[in-house]
Each structure stands twice: as C-alpha cells, then as structure tokens.
C-alpha cells in the first residue's frame, strides 16, 4: 500500500522511508514496554511493496500483532498485509564458494559487489522459474537466499547441490546455523532475549533511530528503570577450560562462597566452536557492559566453571568473510 513505508517506520525502531527499491534492511520490533519482540530482514520489492521476514516460527504472531495495530490504532493508513509464508521455499547458499556456485546456476547474473552488494535482492529466472535472491546472511558468511515458489523448492535445492559438487557442497542444519550466528554475536529472539531485554541491553542501540518522531515502544525506552546502567546486558563468555561447554540456562555468579549467592544472570546460548577450537557462549549479565574481562563463575552439576566476560563477537569482527 501507499503507506507501507510509514507503517514500517512505526513498527520498527529504525528508519524505513528512504530504503531504496531492491535493498534489504534488518529491523527490530519492540513491545509497547520497550522490550524486544521480534526481528528480521525486510526487503523493498517496489515503491509500495515490501516482503518481511520474522524469527523462525514467529510469522503468524507478528502478522496478528501488525494487523491489530493496523486495524485498531492506524486504520487511516493505506496498508494491506498478506501472509506468504507457505508460498515460498528458501535455499540458502552459504560460505566462501557461494558466489561461484550461484554464478554456475545463473551465469548471466552480475554478482559483483557493485551490482549485487550485501543487503540487496534480485529477481531472476532459474530454469524458467521466477525466483528472488537476497544477499543476506545469518551465519556471518557470504550468503545468498534463493526464494522460489514452494512447489519448485526441491528442484531449486537439487540445482544448488548439483552446481556445488565441485566445491564439496554439503547441507547444513539449524544447529550449525545457530553456532555460526553465535560466533558473530547475532541474537535469536526468544533465546538470547526473554521479554525483559531492550535493544540497549542487547548492545544494539545502533538500531534505534534518534531522529524518528515515534515508533512502538519508544517512550518506554526512556523510562528511568529502562535506562538504568546496571540492567542485565548481553555479553560473551569464554571458559577457562576451552573444552567445557556451558549449559544453556545455567546461572552466573561472582562469588562462590557468598550466602545467599547473588545471581548475576544466565547463559542464553552455548556451543563448541570448531572454527575457534574452543567453547563460546552468550549470556545476559547484570551491568554486563562494565564487566568486560571480569572473572565470573557458572555453577554446573558437578563443578563450578570459571569464565571470563568477553565481547559478543567471537569471529571475523571486521566482517571480512561476510563481504568476501
């Protein structure tokens, strides 16, 4: 609809009115209390046409929430929402050879950074099948997401597998995806958030517009309690023994002999990283941004694990692989 850009400006924390056609943007939604509700990448397909992605399994809830606002709060806006979740199948080509594989599949598509930069999309034909390709990444690697009509999903998948054989292509699952995104410090809403986290708590204040007049949850971000310096904040954790993988949900303490023991936070995501050859974890810790380098403890079933508070980005901090 003609007010689609204005609608996105109101539901996301960042700005959308100047997003160019053919470009993608990561967006963060808040509840009215200022806490993170959902995130995803939205692409501008045309002047008045966008396609929005949400967290895994969150599409129906987000659609319901947006419809509620559209019908009860902003009925004057010329906007129409349609669920296309079941209409498309998506194959994600991910890794340093993904550009070479895509070039084999669509040899006449210019994949140069000038023509097809990160966070942009193209409409193409693959074996006469109309597809959308987004150059976006949740793994931190060079990635292309191919969206095809659902009935052609398997055909596109097989096309990717066949084209990638010479590069030793292999399917990867959600566990691998979760590990790779954790190495980059990318959050999963509902895992690294719990309904009490603001963008600032997640070290994502960069995504909150300072210029927009309003958006859902903006006023609540400036409440005294929400602006406290010692709120629980997202941090990285590194174990003293790099082979120990922390339990997700485990509590974090500063003193082992304190009675009663004060719980500073908990582990939200934890994995062993083959890329780094050590365990990594994300956690929310009270006053976390001022705890960098501090030694803390994570009590587990058989022993107390010593950890050090670290940056949330463990790998490729300069995004060299993402922009390869």
PLM features: what roles do these ranges have?
Residues 2-36, 98-129:
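Internal amphipathic helical hairpin motif
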Residues 10, 14-69:
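Well-ordered mid-protein domain cores that form the structural environment of catalytic cofactors
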Residues 45-324:
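Conserved, structured C-terminal
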